């Protein structure tokens, strides 16, 4: 179920503070965050935000199409390497 419009978008305060600081200083340095649950707001467009995937921070450039989505949607947390090969099938 989507979030109520009455409540507005959720963005962690510490992330929003870093976004405003980066805009004021025109910094191109990526903003590191662990907040995958934060929604992308129009203030973030053009910034690079490094979102944590459980192991490392993956840089993501914010575009207009991303507004309204959550940061975690753009960084994969699971790495699928395929099923193990069947040893019996290899011998034939």
Curated annotation (Swiss-Prot):
Record InterPro entries: Ribosomal_uS19, Ribosomal_uS19_bac-type, Ribosomal_uS19_CS, Ribosomal_uS19_SF
Keyword Ligase attributed: no
Annotated GO CC locations: cytoplasm; small ribosomal subunit
Keywords: Ribonucleoprotein, Ribosomal protein, RNA-binding, rRNA-binding
UniProt-listed GO biological process terms: ribosomal small subunit assembly; translation
GO molecular function: rRNA binding; structural constituent of ribosome
A Pfam family of this chain: Ribosomal_S19
PANTHER family xref list: RIBOSOMAL PROTEIN S19P FAMILY MEMBER, SMALL RIBOSOMAL SUBUNIT PROTEIN US19M
Family per similarity comment: Belongs to the universal ribosomal protein uS19 family.
Function: Protein S19 forms a complex with S13 that binds strongly to the 16S ribosomal RNA.
Protein name: Small ribosomal subunit protein uS19
Gene that encodes it: rpsS
């Amino acid at each position: 179920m989507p979030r109520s419009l009455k409540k507005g978008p959720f963005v962690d305060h510490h992330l929003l503070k870093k976004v405003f600081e980066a805009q004021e200083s025109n910094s191109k340095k990526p903003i590191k965050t662990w907040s995958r649950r934060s929604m992308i707001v129009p203030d973030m467009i053009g910034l690079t935000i490094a979102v944590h995937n459980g192991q490392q921070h993956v840089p993501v450039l914010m575009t207009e199409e991303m507004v309204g989505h959550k940061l975690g949607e753009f960084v994969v947390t699971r790495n699928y390497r395929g099923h193990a090969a069947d040893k019996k099938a290899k011998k034939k």
